[in-house]
Amino acid sequence: VATEKDYQNLINSFESQTWLIKLSPWGMRLYLTLLEEEKADKAILLRDIHTLFEAANYSSQSPQAKIFKPTKGKLSKYEGYKEKLFNDAYEGTMDEEFLKLVKSLDRHYYHVAIMELLEANIPLLQRFTTSEDKIIAQRATSLIEAIKHPKIYPISQ
């Protein structure tokens, strides 16, 4: 059974400045998968998912995000990325073409991907709102509310 330190090490690796941008959507997928494991500490996972969601939400409202202008090419790349990220049958193989796409994807889309991935997984999260463990139920409810009604940050340029 994983300890809280194990979970903290996992989220710390996802939050490192160098990797947060590129790993967070895949880290989020890992967290969602772990939520379905019987022995996983769901209270810790839900807390950490909420942390990553808030980071993505904040970053999506940054001055750089506000001036971001999507193009057909950028949207096409994001759709290709999303196709694998949202595909439960995708086994994780990253061929040369997909690695090239990941490296060229604008960082704005990594934040958007986290938010969209969580929104798509609200049905999974709702299963935990009725948990007998009050902490799990409260964290799941709080996370769903945050996803449905993202906080608006007063960010100035």
Write out the residue ranges for each language-model feature:
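Acidic, serine/threonine- and proline-enriched intrinsically disordered linkers and terminal tails
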Residues: E54-L125
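Alpha-helical solenoid scaffolds in large eukaryotic transport, assembly, and signaling factors
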Residues: V1-E37, D41-K69, Y109-A113
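Core register positions within helices of long alpha-helical scaffolds
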Residues: N9, R47-L52, L124, R139-A146
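Glycine-rich, aromatic-bearing surface loops/beta-hairpins
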Residues: S142-Q157
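Buried hydrophobic core positions in alpha-solenoid tandem helical repeats
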Residues: Y31-L32, L124-Q126
